[in-house]
From Swiss-Prot:
Cofactor(s) listed: Mg(2+)
Taxonomic path: Eukaryota, Metazoa, Chordata, Craniata, Vertebrata
MF GO annotations: 3'-5' exonuclease activity; 5'-deoxyribose-5-phosphate lyase activity; chromatin binding; DNA binding; DNA-directed DNA polymerase activity; exonuclease activity; metal ion binding; protease binding
Subunit structure: Heterotrimer composed of a catalytic subunit and a homodimer of accessory subunits (POLG:POLG2). Interacts with TTC3. Interacts with LIG3.
Function summary: Catalytic subunit of DNA polymerase gamma solely responsible for replication of mitochondrial DNA (mtDNA). Replicates both heavy and light strands of the circular mtDNA genome using a single-stranded DNA template, RNA primers and the four deoxyribonucleoside triphosphates as substrates. Has 5' -> 3' polymerase activity.
Organism: Rattus norvegicus
Chief site of localization: mitochondrion
Residues reported to bind RNA: 560, 731, 740, 745, 840, 846
The protein, known as: DNA polymerase subunit gamma-1
Motif Exo II, residue range(s) on this chain: 250-258
InterPro entries documented for this protein: DNA-dir_DNA_pol_A_CS, DNA-dir_DNA_pol_A_mt, DNA-dir_DNA_pol_A_palm_dom, DNA/RNA_pol_sf, DNApol_Exo, POLG_palm_dom, RNaseH-like_sf
Amino acid sequence: MSRLLWKKVAGAKVASGPVPATGRWVSSSVLDPVPSDGQPQSQMPSSENGQLRLNPLHIQMLSRGLHEQIFGCGGDVPDEAAVQRSIEHLRKHGLWGQPTTPLPDVQLRLPRLFGGNLDQHFRLLAQKQSLPYLEAAASLSEAQLPPQPRKWVWAEGWTRYGPEGEAEPVAIPEERALVFDVEVCLAEGTCPTLAVAISPSAWYSWCSRRLVEERYSWTSQLSPADLIPLGVSASASSSTQQDWQEQLVVGHNVSFDRAHIREQYLIQGSRMRFLDTMSMHMAISGLSSFQRSLWMGAKQGKHKTQHPTKRGQKSQKNANGPAISSWDWMDISSANNLADVHNLYVGGPRLAKEPRELFVKGSMRDIRENFQDLMEYCARDVWATFEVFQQQLPLFLERCPHPVTLAGMLEMGVSYLPVNQNWERYLTEAQSTYEELQREMKKSLMELANDACQLLSGERYKEDPWLWDLEWDLQEFKQKKAKKVKKTASASKLPIEGAGPFGDPMDQEDPGPPSEEEELQQNIMAHTRLQQLKSTTDLLPKRPQHLPGHPGWYRKLCPRLDDPAWTPGPSLLSLQMRVTPKLMALTWDGFPLHYSDSHGWGYLVPGRRDNLTELPVSPTEESAAVTCPYRAIESLYRRHCLDQGKQQLETQETDLAEEFLLTDSAMWQTVEELGCLDVEAEATVESSGLSQPLVPPTACAPKTSQPTYHHGNGPYNDVDIPGCWFFKLPHKDGNNYNVGSPFAKDFLPKMEDGTLQAGPGGARGPRALEINKMISFWRNAHKRISSQMVVWLPRSALPRAVTRHPSFDEESHYGAILPQVVTAGTITRRAVEPTWLTASNARPDRVGSELKAMVQAPPGYVLVGADVDSQELWIAAVLGDAHFAGMHGCTAFGWMTLQGRKSRGTDLHSKTAATVGISREHAKVFNYGRIYGAGQSFAERLLMQFNHRLSRQEAADKAQQMYAVTKGLRRYRLSDDGEWLVKQLNVPVDRTEDGWVSLQDLRKIRREASRKSRWKKWEVVTERAWTGGTESEMFNKLESIAMSDTPRTPVLGCCISRALEPSVVQGEFMTSRVNWVVQSSAVDYLHLMLVAMKWLFEEFAIDGRFCISIHDEVRYLVREEDRYRAALALQITNLLTRCMFAYKLGLNDLPQSVAFFSAVDIDQCLRKEVTMDCKTPSNPTGMERKYGIPQGEALDIYQIIELTKGSLEKRSQPGP
């Protein structure tokens, strides 16, 4: 049945009855667990020299025992010519003959494998795991569904509707497959309000108790009773996963619906799995981020023009981006929302989404009053999702034919994060710390504003480098005319006379302690003056003035007296105001910040003289008010140079700051975001012969008016500041963008390295800047974090392993968060989730950054996981190795990935850093950026972002040097027309040994051809390739896949999105396509791991479940007693997954250095390293002292084998 179904739906070819190698493989016909022979698995016999294996390039491979168990006896003999070619290549790049240290061999008896090879093994495992769900999906997609009910029942719980619309209450929909949709009244919290489901046999509706029963208020804490029951009714405390029925739930963005299902919060998990039509759409016809912006722009302009080409021409004319010549992809793709996806796959009238606004903005009363209409809306969405699913399923199985893809996505869809009462404590502590720091910052800013206001005395503000251009106009004190002129005049002089001007000697004299008579006289005089003052109240205007005598900018910061939220002082001041950077006296490399309406935030560089002559000889009051104190700015910069140890106003070579702390998902997200900005313009370069960097914006000043001692983004001389040039602050997306706030998170690294700092005088400015940095994480993320849906489990819902554990506390709370992971949220099929998959690691200067550590295992359980070491780098390297000479490590890139050592400077990042003269951390970003398809212009932008002191030309030179050494030089093979032109025109051409010609020769040929035959366009190139670099072969392989007729991942054969296929995009979007090859292969890697782990957990009765995968790391929730066996399972999984990659690429071997995880983490919480105490401003004492969580264990393969005796069998497991 399984093979027939897969052949029918997926077109998978499964060989029947392969002959297994003796003692190594189990026949593919055996899908049930292999019976034990009653003996524990023993380790491989050890021999001192018989196990060590080296390939011809002196790279240590798997031990003989492991190699024979996985790949069989013997092996491919490498071609001698290929070996010599590899040696010469490595010698050219200074890597041949480098000393290496062999690793101890791993002696391990693996579980017996299915099928005749690794591919069949994984195929059969995945078929077994996904078959029940595939059968359910097939039956659902082929079913004739019953008609929709005409009227929906107003009743708590589930209602089933028969074929004739008859309604009956049911406990749960006992169906194998459902299309499901949940709606939530957001005004009432996250509790589900109503739901609709459909199966092949019936419609179902569900209403919450909060909808049916009217109460004044409901508790905000959610329990399982508030959620939707959808699984088999069983006692949660005694059930295991095997007690649940296998069910499939289909939905659009189904992770949202899953978060409202009761059984999904149980620790043991269930056998319900989820298929997301949004994820399937991304895999079939998803859009890259750049395509999505084009698609949205075209959609918004549809009423203006209907022809895509015209839209494209318009975009080319108006946009700063690349010229898009092919628009066919727009007809076979869409955005991700259900309405657009339904329109793409099904067509017909557009879905009406207006009723959804009632759930977003309305109250529960509104929903009750519109119950039938809203149920109808929800049912329409369910029906639309079913229609989309019918069209998608065969397309998905055709384009992702390997069963591992489906099985991996099903497993990815059941992420689970356990939490306890520490979660609420974390939220409280982080918010209170944030508010306390915010109050301190507010106080510092208000004091800065009060101090700045004092500069009005003596017009000292005119010499201030920051405050000179603020509104210093004063509002005069107004009063009514007095009836009795003489008395009023004499009386009105008294308070003024007594007040005296600021700094008057009368106020500063100290005559000593007064006598009793003097005190009495003073009291009488004070009483008299008070009475006189009271008598003048009638002179006040009817509407009181707002702070007369204070400058205009200060008055705007103070609330009016009639404001209900009035507080004294400049309490309206915040970081979002433009005056704040000026009050804090912010400087950029010693230059004062300045705001321009046309260019945003920048800074003033003194020394300009060409605009000083334009100053009026006798300036008016207005012009004097805006005269820049350029001499004060010069003095400010001189002091900065002295403080920094600079003797002259000249640029000094400085080390790059380590501002990019790139860890876990931040690495690839940062690079991918920047890489998307890069546009491949190779065709233009080839035809035009222009390879110069981009011309600076026209707004920049001519060379005759720019500073010699400073260069940056500018100068922009349309900002005419006498005596100064205006330079823009660098924007992360390029110089054409304006900076809206210097307090944005992109400038935090510049605050840390001292480039952006508060000015001289006092500690208030620097402290406010420091606090801004500390609260930045919580300010940006607290809404997402605080709105996480936490469901607390009653004791009856906890398994015995928890309640009987010694550390179980009756007073504590235990619950879970279900991260709403979109299993394929990008065109690379990467998972997407806004909070957990983007969470950074704990930092001592970031409030709330200990977020991940709040995921804590319940008593009796631990979190077991590991990071895949250099996942994308190894995938790209092994692709290049297989392409070049068919040996591991035969390219310089592959050798550095496998054998490179940071201590010797031979690893990839150290080599790149040494080549360009940058830090190793920055080199990581460039290396990943190239692999993701980013070109040289990306490197130029990134170099200037890392080091803003670089000129554009310096950045271009460094980038060119980096790409010449790594990616190599572009070479071309001439077509028949090209060869004919060379002969006919007698064009001298230098060729390599392989017949390649350079870009310069190609331009020469084209120039001569266009001169002799003006109107004919010659196709002179038949093939392009990179040569001479450490990564040339790898890029040639990536580009050959990306430019093939139907790009597929090399291991699992998944197709690229239809919107990026060469037939519809021609030569466009190459960055996205090359990026897809590596990242989509990394998703294949993850899916293989998930399938292998599920097999080993079931085969050897390891009590655990999948928790989450964050980019290249996986975490499992495991019973404490099974923790070491789970760690061994992870190591075996990594070994088999890497071997699967090698096998599919024709490399029947694997280097020892990448076979196993460097360490498997066993911990009670989720953190990057088991030794991290996660100290932050909101957790100053650390995890152990505050939350009672000790350090975990990090075990390598040798330690794990020692603890488990190399066996996954339970009886061999040592006690804790």
